[in-house]
């Protein structure tokens, strides 16, 4: 009975692709130096991003770093307790090359909006569908770090497994959300878009993609 009530009360989320990122939260001089040092490196590794003290101010690699032509085509979030789909988005088929390049740039920064009770969910399944280019991928890894202002909420670390060349792949990652205090949830609801995430994608321990998102919980 409780699961049925929860399923009915959680409205589907939404996503937009703003042309500009909001001004990042204040950071220490050390954080700026750390990010600058990473940008000066020839190769950024998982250990590098895990050592960052906060959300990044910008992107740590350009779209051209994606030499494997990894393209995410579908994304869905569902509540595993109720099987209720909370959010779903898919790229249209048969896009022109010019449109694909523009989408690759705009999709690097997404703004999500969910209902307040999204913060009370315990376990969520995130299904992604993606394509790869002519080169097989043997070690594809994602590290996703979520912050509220300057506080680290959770760090997720997922492996995608082997991907054949010119293949379309899909997998579901399980997100176990941290238990948040009522005061923290209220702060996150009352400060839309101050909850942010960095999603870092690595192939053979080298950063090839970096996406950013912010979140509001006032839908």
UniProtKB/Swiss-Prot annotation:
Record InterPro entries: Ig_E-set (IPR014756), PDE6D_unc-119_myristoyl-bd (IPR051519), PDED_dom (IPR008015), PDED_dom_sf (IPR037036)
Alphabetical list of Pfam families matching this protein: GMP_PDE_delta
Inactivation phenotype: Worms exhibit diverse nervous system defects including defects in feeding behavior and chemosensation. Phenotypes are due to defects in protein trafficking, such as mislocalization of odr-3 and gpa-13 proteins in olfactory neurons.
Binding-site list for tetradecanoate: 112
Keyword terms: Cilium biogenesis/degradation, Developmental protein, Lipid-binding, Protein transport, Transport
Entry keyword annotation includes Transport: yes
Tissue: Predominantly neuron-specific.
GO cellular component: axon; cilium
GO molecular function, one term: lipid binding
Polar residues biased stretches: 1-19
Single Gene Ontology BP annotation: nervous system development
Region feature (Disordered): 1-27
Top-level division of the source organism's lineage: Eukaryota
Family: Belongs to the PDE6D/unc-119 family.
Role of this protein: Myristoyl-binding protein that acts as a cargo adapter: specifically binds the myristoyl moiety of a subset of N-terminally myristoylated proteins and is required for their localization. Plays a key role in ciliary membrane localization of proteins. Required for the establishment or function of the nervous system.
Domain free text: Adopts an immunoglobulin-like beta-sandwich fold forming a hydrophobic cavity that capture N-terminally myristoylated target peptides. Phe residues within the hydrophobic beta sandwich are required for myristate binding.
Protein name stated in the entry: Protein unc-119
Organism for this UniProt entry: Caenorhabditis elegans
């Amino acid at each position: 009975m409780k699961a049925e009530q929860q399923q009915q009360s959680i409205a589907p989320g939404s996503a937009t692709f703003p042309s500009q990122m909001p001004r990042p939260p204040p950071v220490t001089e050390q954080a700026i130096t750390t990010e600058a040092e990473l940008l000066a490196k020839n190769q950024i590794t998982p250990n590098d991003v895990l050592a960052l003290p906060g959300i990044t101010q910008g992107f740590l690699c350009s779209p051209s770093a994606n030499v494997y032509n990894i393209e995410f085509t579908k994304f869905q979030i569902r509540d595993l307790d109720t099987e209720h789909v909370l959010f779903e988005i898919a790229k249209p088929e048969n896009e022109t090359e010019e449109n694909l390049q523009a989408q690759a740039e705009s999709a690097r920064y997404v703004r999500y909006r969910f209902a307040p009770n999204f913060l009370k969910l315990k376990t969520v399944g995130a299904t992604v569908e993606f394509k790869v280019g002519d080169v097989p991928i043997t070690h594809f890894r994602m590290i996703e770090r979520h912050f509220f202002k300057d506080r680290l909420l959770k760090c997720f670390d997922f492996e995608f497994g082997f991907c054949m060349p010119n293949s379309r792949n899909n997998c579901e990652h399980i997100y176990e959300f941290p238990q948040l205090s009522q005061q923290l949830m209220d702060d996150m609801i009352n400060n839309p878009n101050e909850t942010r995430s960095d999603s870092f994608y690595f192939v053979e321990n080298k950063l090839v993609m970096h996406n950013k998102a912010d979140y509001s919980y006032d839908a």
